[in-house]
């Protein structure tokens, strides 16, 4: 026989890092390896977040008073920036001071979260496989629609950071990829309720 250690989910970890950065909260994650987060942690650093690694796989993240932008991201296979984190980074960048260009090289039509983010007040312009994100001062609660798993997670993170209440349809997509995400995000100070729509 053999013993295997299953690595932590870097996309789930990245989701919580983005949510904390958007809401201005400090976060400690346990169980992730530095190499797993590579390009994600580098992108967070470019927004002004400070990341500290401790022994035993502890990662501390402290966001700046105002997130920063003015850089470009290109998605790609590991170790490049993961396409599954692109919607979350886009959500974060909506509140960053400056402009960022995101180039999606893995999947076509991977910017479905942009429509919902714009309903919340974001300034995003799509041109083919490239998205230009111009940071705004604040987002506002809105009724939005998750069209896939990561789109839903991005909209939830944006709803946490937005002023007022948001209604995010399509929670079944998010529940498929995250275990009790509403509980985890509530630890960041959000008030989330899952409801059945008739």
What are these regions (language model features)?
Residues 1-198:
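Short, structured segments at the rim of ligand-binding sites
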